[in-house]
Amino acid sequence: MRILSMLSALALASVAAPGRAQPLKITTSIETFASLARSIGGSNVQVESLSRGYQDPHFVEAKPNLVVVLSQADLLVYAGLDLEIGWLPPLVQNSRNARIQSGASGNLNASTAIDVLDVPSAKVDRGQSDIHPRGNPHYWIPPVNALKVAKEIAERLKQIDPSHASAYDANLQAFGAELKAKVPGWTAKAAALKGLKVVTYHKSWTYVSRWLGLEEVGYVEDKPGIPPDPRHLAELIERMKAQGVKVLLIENYYNRSIAQLVTDKSGARLLVMPSDVGATALTKSYVELVDEVVGKLAAAS
């Protein structure tokens, strides 16, 4: 953190520089939001993600160079719901960029547009696990949610850069039309998935399960972010056998050894899934990400 503080002077110099050049600079916490921002901003924006699609968004290393990136941002887009709580807030603070501080027009918590799932009914202690007290933050894959985030990005861009408002509206309309054209194909491909019983490593596929009609039977992690104990795994394996679970979903950034043990003993198939743009060479955009997610699930059903 000392290094972050040392870079604050450079960050401040960047913020204070007059005559800010176009295009507008958008910084995002994950690659999916970067893809959405490029779709909406077009040639009027320059977009950079603070994390890569193959990284766990809960645990991104707060490297000093990210302070400089944030110091130059006109708009920051992040998932919220405490997904980035372990690394993003100190970077934003040390950037000394008034444009992206909490409450500023350049600070966009994308979760405010989402119908949030898994909101705990009782008070939770984050010290015991990676439970999110405000609800599940892994919401960006279903098209309805991606479009909501895209609309929020468009609105913020119009506030920050009203001279290009018509371009942002046109780009949003084009993105919405692209999704409208793709959804019937995704829905048809996923028709056989309705009622499919699955287990997931982390409780991060809830929104996808709700969208595609999957039934989540259990989770390898008994408590989010905490390695499971043998008793939980034994109970999970027996439940999978009893209910005929054939698929276990895991993101490509998790260690697969425990999940592989569960599938070996239960007879299920381990399906390594991309959960963010850039997770694989086949997921270079939001649409490609959904293509890959739906395609892999359909092939495994």
What do the predicted segments below correspond to?
Residues 1-7:
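Bacterial N-terminal signal peptides that target proteins for export
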Residues 21-301:
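Extracytoplasmic metal-acquisition and chelation regions
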